């Protein structure tokens, strides 16, 4: 079984064929898909998707790319929503949250304030975090050290080995996906090959970050089987071993997956 720890399955790119996309994921061997929210207006959507589909889990949060549009009461609404769903069997934690120092025109002070409040919230309720760390790993790590949420995932990580080790030491797993499939992504591929096996999880970030064989087309969770095969080749492991270790890692850092049973075992295909 494979777990896609980061997929925006609620995105409009899937509106015309979402059911088929989910079916294809199951046929490819996926037993769980984690769908993080990005702003207040899709909180209902990701929760409803998780409640409708037996292999979908959800997270709630405010993504750094959308904080300029966040309302003054969004953080309080997030707190109230988290209090309401913290015992929901499909709720994995707070995400997607973090900092983005790459996209121009964002209010960095606003990003920082919103991120800090969400990390504090995760720590208060003992919830994992799903992190956006683009060009911002050190600043994100600083807040993790300060508030100490119990676990989480650094999604689409592309920092240094030292930065990765700091995150791992704080209970985070490191997410690898489509970017790893490009030969030119040397840093990401080195990280995937060399970081501790217990730190690795898989993701698609679909419909974004398409793997090499799909780029520039739409990504989808079914591609995770071939992404897992790339990781297996980089580490000199079998596909089955990679599936087993990344699934165990995902369930460790997102305990709701383990507590509610992240899908039934399935054959892993690469078609």
What is each of the regions a protein language model found here?
Residues 1-271:
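Mid-domain alpha/beta scaffold segments of enzyme catalytic cores
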């Amino acid at each position: 079984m494979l777990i896609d720890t980061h997929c925006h399955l609620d995105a409009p790119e899937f509106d015309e064929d979402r059911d088929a996309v989910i079916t294809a994921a199951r046929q490819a061997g996926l037993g769980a898909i984690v769908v993080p929210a990005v702003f207040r207006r899709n909180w209902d959507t990701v929760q409803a998707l998780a409640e409708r589909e037996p292999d979908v889990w959800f997270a709630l949060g405010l993504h750094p790319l959308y904080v300029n549009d966040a309302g003054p009461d969004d953080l309080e609404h997030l707190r109230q929503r988290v209090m309401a769903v913290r015992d929901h069997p499909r709720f994995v934690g707070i995400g997607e949250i973090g900092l983005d120092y790459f996209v121009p025109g964002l209010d960095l002070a606003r990003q920082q304030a919103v991120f800090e409040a969400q990390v504090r919230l995760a720590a208060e309720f003992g919830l994992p975090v799903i992190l956006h760390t683009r060009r911002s790993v050190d600043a994100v790590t600083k807040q993790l050290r300060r508030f100490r949420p119990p676990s989480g995932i650094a999604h689409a990580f592309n920092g240094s080995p030292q930065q990765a080790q700091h995150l791992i030491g704080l209970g985070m797993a490191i997410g690898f996906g489509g970017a790893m499939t490009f030969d030119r992504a040397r840093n990401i591929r080195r990280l995937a090959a060399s970081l501790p096996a217990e730190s690795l999880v898989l993701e698609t970030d679909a419909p974004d970050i398409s793997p090499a064989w799909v780029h520039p087309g739409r990504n989808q969770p079914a591609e995770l089987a071939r992404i897992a095969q790339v990781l297996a080749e980089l580490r000199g492991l079998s596909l089955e071993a990679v599936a087993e270790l990344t699934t165990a890692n995902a369930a460790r850092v997102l305990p709701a997956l383990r507590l509610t049973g992240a899908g039934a075992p399935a054959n892993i295909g690469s078609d």
